UniProtKB/Swiss-Prot annotation:
Organism, scientific name: Pyrococcus abyssi (strain GE5 / Orsay)
Name of the featured protein: Tryptophan synthase beta chain 1
Family stated for the protein in its record: Belongs to the TrpB family.
EC number: 4.2.1.20
CC cofactor: pyridoxal 5'-phosphate
PANTHER family: TRYPTOPHAN SYNTHASE, TRYPTOPHAN SYNTHASE-RELATED
Gene Ontology CC: cytoplasm
Main EC class the enzyme belongs to: lyase
Modified residues (N6-(pyridoxal phosphate)lysine): K82
Keyword annotations of the record: Amino-acid biosynthesis, Aromatic amino acid biosynthesis, Lyase, Pyridoxal phosphate, Tryptophan biosynthesis
Protein's UniProt keywords contain Cell membrane: no
Length: 388
């Protein structure tokens, strides 16, 4: 329930019953043979696991220094790591006897992943989305509807993600007998950060086996981008006990920390309570959640998962920032040297890995979690970069 002093269940009494029910069911099902057999089946045959660990030889040569490997979550069905958690939680809900999934989404990626999992398992899906985001993300809204989901625009407050979260929670309190609230990252009240981490840690388990096979040794460094933090937690967790492996999370530096236009909760935030958990958040003097900025829609979250807060405080992981500009450069670099167009989120991790590789020796090994593909970001890049 707690990661050091972080985490917890900072929720109204009305949410305690559904959370207790979820915790009990997860404890029962996580080692259940039939549940795991079905999860493994869908991950393999529907989602396309295991994803490859790819040695980026041309990028490595160009950069000079450490070998750079990419864990190819961009090749997962749906185009990003989000699918691991969506199918895991949807199956969990089905085993609990639920018939409906509720989720909130900002950029739309988590909504799409939830809609995919709901369609696969024959469940009703309702997605809450800030009215402003509905306007900005027309293609993802269409995708969700195509997959059979009902998209509910939220017109309250700032009409963005945090308002969508409030509406989704309100719905869950009223309907939890037959609904499951599917959180998309390692955030929220206990047991969500643990559940999401466990479903995502398939990334790290595979990467560990794959790097031992390729190099005969563990990597020196693992680099992953951090918004809420689920792709990073997924690749970090199976390596946490290996003290020789440096774990580096890359936050969105936006237009630079000094500018105030960023999403770097661990580097520039303060400890507070939001979304049912104690963690680091970007807050103003009054403790109100600040508006965030990142060129990568998926890093635009004003907080971070409690386990990351704990890994930072305990010194087990390091957290750095990469600006919009640096991420864009890495986006183009990887596209041109390896023929892989990364998501802008993942490009933050690539950018830091390039910087780091230059300072390391040729015998050293870096694994980058390439958490998603960049098709969804082409409009953004076109606007910012103009003709490539």
């Amino acid at each position: 329930m707690w990661f050091g002093k972080f985490g917890g269940q900072y929720v109204p009494e009305t949410l305690m019953e559904p959370l207790r029910e979820l915790e009990k069911a997860y404890k029962r099902l996580k080692n259940d043979e039939e549940f795991n057999r079905q999860l493994d089946y869908y991950l393999r045959t529907w989602a396309g696991r295991p994803t490859p660990l790819y040695y980026a030889e041309r990028l490595t040569k160009k950069v000079g220094g450490a070998k750079i490997y990419l864990k190819r979550e961009d090749l997962l069905h749906g185009g990003a790591h989000k699918t691991n958690n969506a199918i895991g939680q949807a199956l969990l809900a089905k085993f609990m006897g639920k018939t409906r999934l509720i989720a909130e989404t900002g950029a739309g990626q988590h909504g799409v992943a939830t809609a995919m999992a709901g369609a696969l398992l024959g469940m009703k899906v309702d997605i809450y989305m800030g009215a402003e985001d509905v306007e900005r993300q027309k293609m993802n809204v269409f995708r969700m509807k195509l997959l059979g989901a009902n998209v509910i625009p939220v017109h309250t407050g700032s009409k963005t993600l945090k308002d969508a979260i409030n509406e989704a929670l309100r719905d869950w309190v009223a309907t939890f007998e037959y609904s499951h609230y599917l959180i998309g990252s390692v955030v929220g009240p206990h047991p969500y950060p643990i559940i999401v981490r466990d479903f995502q840690s398939v990334i790290g388990r595979e990467a560990r086996e794959q790097i031992l096979e390729a190099e005969g040794d563990l990597p020196d460094v693992i680099v992953a981008c951090v918004g809420g933090g689920s792709n990073a937690m997924g690749i970090f967790y199976p390596f946490v006990k290996d003290k020789s492996v440096r774990l580096i999370g890359v936050e969105a530096g936006g237009k630079g920390i000094e500018s105030g236009k960023h999403s770097a909760s661990l580097n520039a935030g303060e400890i507070g309570v939001f979304h049912g958990m104690l963690s680091y958040f970007l807050q103003d003097e009054e403790g109100q959640i600040r508006t965030t900025h990142s060129i990568a829609p998926g890093l635009d979250y004003p907080g971070v998962g409690p386990e990351h807060a704990y890994l930072k405080e305990s010194g087990r992981a390091e957290y750095v920032t990469v600006t919009d500009e640096e991420a864009l450069r890495a986006f183009h670099e990887l596209s041109r040297t390896e023929g892989i167009i990364p998501a802008l989120e993942s490009a933050h991790a690539v950018a830091y890995a390039i910087k780091l590789a230059r300072e390391m020796s040729r015998d050293d090994v870096i694994i980058v979690n390439l958490s998603g593909r960049g098709d969804k970001d082409l409009d953004i890049v076109l606007k910012v970069s103009g003709n490539v």
